[in-house]
């Protein structure tokens, strides 16, 4: 098994810590909030308010299940438009009250069903991209498993994007890439080699800003490491003038 194939397998491992795991272990007094106030509450996106040390923050994540029943309730971590609208509602609330936003991303992509398209999946993702680019509070996005397509990017227009060591981030799944390029989804590993989806490759290209080493899926060292980095980075981001913060975020994505 090649290194990329191993990372692809580990990124999708059902045993990985979820967004709610990180929310409960890194933050204090996490309180989940529900609903987009327009249509429904999408279980594949979770979010709420919490404390990071003494700093109030908004935490948002894409939630996969740990078993079949949970995955069905979470739609296998594939958000509907109401999930992205819930995330945006929480981000605008964070902006109103001056809370930094931290997102945890683990999705193969946004749900491509007919109903999701009818309810404006593309619009919901595009609006998140637009609003996050100008959100007037610090944003840090962390890839904790799969970071697939626009479904991941809709929570990743951030001042800093981090990846755990054995995760992936790509414009689409390797299977989708192989199906388009060679009409053969079984060549996913070969596609992954070409796509440069690993944390090391993306860090080298400047797409991400930090790699979090992994020593096991439930390692207390990982949680503590992320917490300390978050405290340090948010302190630095909050010290910047708002105009500088937003300009650097804009330039970060323009360079691609």
Curated annotation (Swiss-Prot):
InterPro entries: Acetyl_CoA_COase_a_su, ClpP/crotonase-like_dom_sf, COA_CT_C. SUPFAM superfamilies: ClpP/crotonase (SSF52096). One of its GO terms (biological process) is fatty acid biosynthetic process. Its main location: cytoplasm. PANTHER family: ACETYL-COENZYME A CARBOXYLASE CARBOXYL TRANSFERASE SUBUNIT ALPHA, ACETYL-COENZYME A CARBOXYLASE CARBOXYL TRANSFERASE SUBUNIT ALPHA, CHLOROPLASTIC. Component of the acetyl coenzyme A carboxylase (ACC) complex. First, biotin carboxylase catalyzes the carboxylation of biotin on its carrier protein (BCCP) and then the CO(2) group is transferred by the carboxyltransferase to acetyl-CoA to form malonyl-CoA. This is Acetyl-coenzyme A carboxylase carboxyl transferase subunit alpha. It comes from Streptococcus equi subsp. zooepidemicus (strain H70). The gene is accA.
């Amino acid at each position: 098994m090649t290194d990329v194939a191993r990372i692809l397998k580990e990124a999708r491992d059902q045993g990985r810590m979820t967004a709610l795991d990180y929310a409960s272990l890194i933050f204090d007094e996490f309180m989940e909030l529900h609903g987009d106030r327009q249509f429904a509450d999408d279980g594949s996106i979770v979010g709420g308010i919490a404390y990071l040390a003494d700093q109030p923050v908004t935490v948002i994540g894409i939630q996969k299940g740990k078993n079949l029943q949970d995955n069905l309730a979470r739609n296998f971590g594939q958000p509907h438009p109401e999930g992205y609208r819930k995330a945006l509602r929480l981000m605008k609330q964070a902006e109103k009250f001056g809370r930094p936003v931290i997102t945890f991303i683990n999705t193969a992509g946004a749900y491509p069903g007919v109903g999701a398209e009818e309810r404006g999946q593309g619009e919901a993702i595009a609006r998140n991209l637009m609003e996050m680019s100008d959100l007037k509070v610090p944003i840090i996005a962390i890839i904790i498993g799969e970071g697939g397509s626009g479904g991941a990017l809709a929570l990743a227009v951030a001042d800093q994007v981090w990846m755990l060591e054995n995760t992936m981030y790509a414009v689409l799944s390797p299977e989708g890439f192989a199906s388009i390029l060679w009409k053969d989804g079984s060549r996913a590993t070969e596609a992954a080699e070409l796509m440069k989806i690993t944390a090391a490759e993306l860090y080298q290209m400047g797409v991400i800003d930090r790699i979090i080493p992994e020593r096991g899926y439930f390692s207390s060292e990982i949680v503590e490491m992320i917490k300390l980095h978050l405290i340090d980075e948010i302190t630095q981001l909050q010290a910047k003038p708002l105009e500088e913060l937003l300009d650097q975020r804009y330039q970060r994505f323009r360079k691609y």
